[in-house]
Amino acid sequence: MTSTSDSPGMTREMLQNWRVAALARERDGADSSIATEEQLLASRRQLIADDADCSDFWVFGYGSLIYNPIIDHTHRAIASIYGYHRRFCLWTKIGRGSPECPGLVLSLDRGGSCRGVAFQLNPQNAIAELDLLWRREMMTLAYQPRLLSLHTEIGVKLGLDFVANPNR
């Protein structure tokens, strides 16, 4: 099932046609820190290779991914992670902020635990969905992608999540 949102926020199409990055570059200004497509692909490949086995691959949502996942997934489950907690700890000049007035966004910070929703990716197109997710979450490189244990009602699953990059 592919999730869409009725909200005027981010859509699959905006990510697929790279419109989100263009809008972000406009908003970010001349010294834009928006990642290039090549940087995003290299980042994803560093963690998950193009030929990775994604037959049982999950993504953990703790914020906007819960209500607007926009990824093709076959199953969802309530999940908990340990070692990270949800916190408004990243500043942004795009989306919820501007260059003149940065806004805070949720991230996962070290310590504690967090409850959210795990989405099982459709294995038929998992790598393409991960690339779409990288465009969404890694556009400013403010997050670090991590493979974590997701504790669900159907067992512990390996899953991807994005945690606060302490260097940003």
Regions found by a protein language model. Name each.
Residues M1-R168:
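Glycine-aromatic micro-motifs
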